[in-house]
């Protein structure tokens, strides 16, 4: 009845795992008890869990990302500590099979459940506001996409205490991921957590692509869109094209494991290298799915805090489009050692070098925007400058790795690990932190504490270079990635420095937690009463903070790129107008319902509980059919309510002397 699931699936003989899992359960019980005690379940259900408001969904994406960041960071600390101990002549505290699960989970968590939610959360907040829309094109899909990501994260977390996770690395190359070499449920957990969250991401891509193409304010042609919206458009094009490749690849691997197919096996016509090609045809665009939105963040931040028009708007747009196209013809640089031949390697090496050109164009545009500007060193600008330094180093090491002979030496070494983290942390994570500090008032109506924000930045930047610069040297010294036992003692000193860097990053995360706490505590002091605390240039700053549920009482008409900026110079951006009732989408619990049964389907597929798989899949299909015929999906915001909200905003702006 329960397939392969038995009590033996609980790893009671692994004290570290059991203590961790029991701690997670106790924390979950404490949170549930607190919500019950304060009678907040009804509030959470109606205001948050069932919401289709893109702004609230962006907040929930951020919460998911920070929860999973904590889990992923703990994994990183465990790995660093194990390597330090193992390089000092001891065996360490993590057995090899547990260490292998940790480094696999770390990669999956940080890419799929930290970086992606951060990026999608920012797009959820900013895109509709920047294009003058009241919501996304498909509000229900937005809610469903979020909860599918949550289901994927929960399924991955379940593997910690029920069964095991994959020991294959975050991309699960066959034949190691085939059932012959990984007969346990770890790879199945990996497949279904990625499959469920990947479907949610694909729906997000479709949703935002349609939103940007069809819901822009009147007069906003493509070359009047803000650069962040351009970056979001290209990002979602990449999502819509590349994520179906991931879904298909995982499906083929599932057929190999469950039904004895031979797509990626070493025999009966299978081809493991086909898997590697397919996974990286998704994987390298995924890098730019993460990076392009934060390029948009930096464009907005630099222009705002330099008090200047963005330098080279058109070249920035074309550079973004060039990166979007080139990202699909560089994937083979991840495996030059495959043996495809010198001509193939040369082609992909050259395209990899070429993609550095539009990236360089962007960096120079940001520098020229700052040049002779009245630069205000807000914490968002600090994250931006940190990015410029860190990402440039990551880019240079990437160009070095694009040379096939060099890659043959450095492939699978810690040099590669350092390069990858240079790009992802220095680019994506720093960019998301810049965006959070920048747009936080638009979500919550008050400004984040600057003192603790700057402390967080300095611990992060110093910790990052302390943690990852030694890895470049270790790579040159010949240390390969994913080692946990019998590490050469000559690596001990540099590994110890890297571990100190990880601790400094941990202090940076603690500073961010304190920043949020202090900001909430002092929110009445740091209120954003005007909706435009930074003297911004784009449409989102024309609304109150927090932005009203309908975003815009009257859809704006756009005349130029920096329309709001021009209106402010004319001193007439806010005035009393005639309003009409607005139709807005209703909240729905169907998204969380479908995602729960998707989670059940994934769990039952992992453990071969066939009856539960069929039942949960059937419930998902019936729910989607029910949603497709439901016509009661909207409610009306009255003119009286709109006037109340807008007049209050007008009064605040007039008091601030901005009329």
Curated annotation (Swiss-Prot):
A ubiquinone binds at residues 71, 75, 98. Its main location: membrane. Coiled coil: none annotated. Heme b binds at residues 106, 170, 421, 481-482. The chain crosses the membrane at residues 15-35, 59-79, 107-127, 146-166, 190-210, 226-246, 278-298, 310-330, 348-368, 381-401, 414-434, 457-477, 491-511, 581-601, 606-626. Its cofactor is Cu(2+); heme b; Fe(II)-heme o. GO terms for biological process: aerobic respiration; electron transport coupled proton transport; respiratory electron transport chain. It is found in: Cell membrane. Residues 36-58, 128-145, 211-225, 299-309, 369-380, 435-456, 512-580, 627-659 are cytoplasmic. Cytochrome bo(3) ubiquinol oxidase is the terminal enzyme in the aerobic respiratory chain. Catalyzes the four-electron reduction of O2 to water, using a ubiquinol as a membrane soluble electron donor for molecular oxygen reduction. Has proton pump activity across the membrane in addition to electron transfer, pumping 2 protons/electron and generating a proton motive force. All the redox centers of this enzyme complex are located within the largest subunit, subunit I. Protons are probably pumped via D- and K- channels found in this subunit. This is Cytochrome bo(3) ubiquinol oxidase subunit 1. The lineage of its organism: Bacteria, Pseudomonadati, Pseudomonadota, Gammaproteobacteria, Enterobacterales. The gene is cyoB.
């Amino acid at each position: 009845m329960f397939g392969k699931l038995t009590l033996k699936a609980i790893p009671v003989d692994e004290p570290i795992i059991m203590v961790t899992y029991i701690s997670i359960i106790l924390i979950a019980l404490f949170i549930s008890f607190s919500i019950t005690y304060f009678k907040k379940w009804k509030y959470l259900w109606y205001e948050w869990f069932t919401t289709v408001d893109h702004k609230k969904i962006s907040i929930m994406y951020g919460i998911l990302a920070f929860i999973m960041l904590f889990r992923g960071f703990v994994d990183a600390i465990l790995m660093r500590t194990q390597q330090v101990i193992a390089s000092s002549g001891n065996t360490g505290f993590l057995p090899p099979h547990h260490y292998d699960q940790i480094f696999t989970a770390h990669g999956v968590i940080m890419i799929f459940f930290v970086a992606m939610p951060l990026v999608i959360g920012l797009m959820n907040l900013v895109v509709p506001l920047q294009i003058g829309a009241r919501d996304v094109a498909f509000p229900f899909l937005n809610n469903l996409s979020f909860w599918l990501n949550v289901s994927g994260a929960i399924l991955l977390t379940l593997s910690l205490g029920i069964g095991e996770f994959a020991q294959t690395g975050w991309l699960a190359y066959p034949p190691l991921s085939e059932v012959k070499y990984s007969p346990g449920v770890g790879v199945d957990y990996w497949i279904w957590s990625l499959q469920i969250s990947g479907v949610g991401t694909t729906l997000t891509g479709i949703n935002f692509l349609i939103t940007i193409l069809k819901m822009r304010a009147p007069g906003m042609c493509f070359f009047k869109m803000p650069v962040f919206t351009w970056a979001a458009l290209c990002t979602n094009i990449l999502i819509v094209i590349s994520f179906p490749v991931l879904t298909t690849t995982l499906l083929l691997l599932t057929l190999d494991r469950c039904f004895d197919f031979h797509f990626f096996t070493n025999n009966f016509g299978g081809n493991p290298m086909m898997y590697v090609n397919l996974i990286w045809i998704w994987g390298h665009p995924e890098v730019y799915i993460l990076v392009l939105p934060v390029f948009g963040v930096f464009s907005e931040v630099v222009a705002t805090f330099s008090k200047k028009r963005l330098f080279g708007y058109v070249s920035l747009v074309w550079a973004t489009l060039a990166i979007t196209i080139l990202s699909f013809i560089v994937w083979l640089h991840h495996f030059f050692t495959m043996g495809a031949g010198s001509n193939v390697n040369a082609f992909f090496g050259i395209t990899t070098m070429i993609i550095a050109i539009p990236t360089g164009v962007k960096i120079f545009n940001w520098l020229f925007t700052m040049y002779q500007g009245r630069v205000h060193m807000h914490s968002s600008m600090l994250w931006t400058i940190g990015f410029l330094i860190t990402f440039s180093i990551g880019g240079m090491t990437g160009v070095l790795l694009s040379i096939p002979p060099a890659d043959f030496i450095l492939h699978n070494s810690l040099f590669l690990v350092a390069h990858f983290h240079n790009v992802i942390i220095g680019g994506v994570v720093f960019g998301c932190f810049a965006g959070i500090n920048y747009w936080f008032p638009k979500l919550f109506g008050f400004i984040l504490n600057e003192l603790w924000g700057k402390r967080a930045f300095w611990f992060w930047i110093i910790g990052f270079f302390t943690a990852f610069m030694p890895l470049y040297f270790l790579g040159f010294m010949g240390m390969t990635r994913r080692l946990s036992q019998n590490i050469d003692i000559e690596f001990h000193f540099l590994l110890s420095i890297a571990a100190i860097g990880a601790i400094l990053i941990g202090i940076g995360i603690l500073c961010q937690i304190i920043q949020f706490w202090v900001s909430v505590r002092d929110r009445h002091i740091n209120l954003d009463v005007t909706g435009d605390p930074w003297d911004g240039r784009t449409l989102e700053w024309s609304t109150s903070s927090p932005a009203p549920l309908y975003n815009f009482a009257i859809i704006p008409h756009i005349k130029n790129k920096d329309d709001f900026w021009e209106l402010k110079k004319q001193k007439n951006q806010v005035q009393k107008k005639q309003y009409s009732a607005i139709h807005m989408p209703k909240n729905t619990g169907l998204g969380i319902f479908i995602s729960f049964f998707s989670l059940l389907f994934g769990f039952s597929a992992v453990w071969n509980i066939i009856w539960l798989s069929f039942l949960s899949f059937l419930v998902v299909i019936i729910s989607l059919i029910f949603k497709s015929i439901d016509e009661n999906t909207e409610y009306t915001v009255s003119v009286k309510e709109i006037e109340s909200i807008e007049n209050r905003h007008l009064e605040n702006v007039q008091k601030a002397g901005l009329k």
